[in-house]
Design a protein with these regions (language model features):
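Extended, low-polarity transmembrane helix blocks
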Residues: 1-38, 54-66, 70-168, 187-193, ...
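Membrane-interface interhelical connector segments
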Residues: 36-49, 140, 168-186
């Protein structure tokens, strides 16, 4: 009996493909950070005023690795998700938010903010899924369906600068489009417009499930069509590896947020949720 109870406490728990991918990416980020001793792309740029940069880089890598592993185990999943949410929200507020007011160009600063916000939103969704009754009593909206809605809005707002960057940095966008696709500028404009439309839809809760799913598909296709061939073609430098992993991190984060709409009609204008933050028709 005791052995069975112990086994139950350590069993793996994966609630969705997005959850599994997000955990895997966090582990990957941790391994990269610990092996290099530097901030991987998901944490960059880091302001020059930050002290003890090397120690902080190792701390970020350790949090990523330990929390990624923790997300896969039933007993530790809630704690792991809470640690990721807390660390990413601190990073968002301390390292990203101030830059919106004095750094330029604004769209690139907002892009960095959005990348961190996507991952924070995904971790927040996972935390609500795994949170127990005690967490809901103690933390209120952070651990209930209101927290999921905040996470979804974070994701929606993040998509808007992703789209704007396609228009403002057209040349940098078109060089990433595979040569076998015709009209690269057209694809750049199209994907930029769809990011903006999806961001507005998710933010305002209009056709949000469809918008979240399609934006996840778009980010995932970018990972597969743009980066996988580059990995297969030859060795990447550290920056390119970082960009490759960040793209998969955004794919994983988007997938988790899209999963939070499960059960909602695809064309629903408004969303209701159960006590665990999962959408319900």
């Amino acid at each position: 009996m005791a052995a069975s109870a112990a086994a139950a406490n350590v069993k793996i728990r994966i609630v969705s493909p997005g959850h599994a991918l997000f955990a895997a990416v966090m582990i990957w980020l941790g391994v990269m950070g610990l092996s290099k001793g530097t901030f991987v792309q998901v944490w960059q740029p880091v302001p020059k005023w930050v002290p003890a940069r090397e120690a902080l880089a190792y701390l970020c890598a350790f949090i990523s690795l330990a929390s990624g592993i923790g997300l896969l185990w039933q007993r530790s999943a809630a704690v792991a998700a809470r640690v990721i949410v807390a660390s990413l929200m601190v990073w968002l507020l301390v390292m990203r938010l101030p830059n919106l007011f004095y750094e330029t160009p604004l769209v690139l600063v907002a892009w960095s903010f959005g990348s961190t916000a996507v991952m924070a939103g995904a971790a927040w969704v996972l935390y609500v899924w795994f949170a127990g009754d005690r967490d809901r009593r103690r933390l209120g909206f952070v651990a209930d369906e209101r927290g999921v809605r905040v996470a979804q809005v974070l994701y929606g707002l993040s998509l808007i600068p992703f789209g704007l960057a396609h228009f403002m940095y057209l040349d940098a966008t078109t060089v990433l489009i595979p040569h076998w696709l015709p009209w690269p500028a057209g694809w750049a404009y199209f994907t930029g417009a769809t990011f903006i439309a999806a961001g507005l839809a998710v933010t305002f809760g209009l056709f949000a499930r469809l918008a979240a799913a399609l934006s996840t598909l778009q980010i995932g296709l970018f990972s597969v069509i743009v980066w996988v061939p580059r990995v297969l073609a030859g060795p990447l430098n550290d920056f390119q590896w970082g960009e490759f992993v960040v793209t998969w991190a955004l794919t994983a984060g988007a997938w988790v947020v899209a999963d939070s709409y499960r059960g909602t009609p695809w064309l629903a204008g408004r969303v209701t949720r159960d006590s665990e933050g999962r959408s319900a028709a």
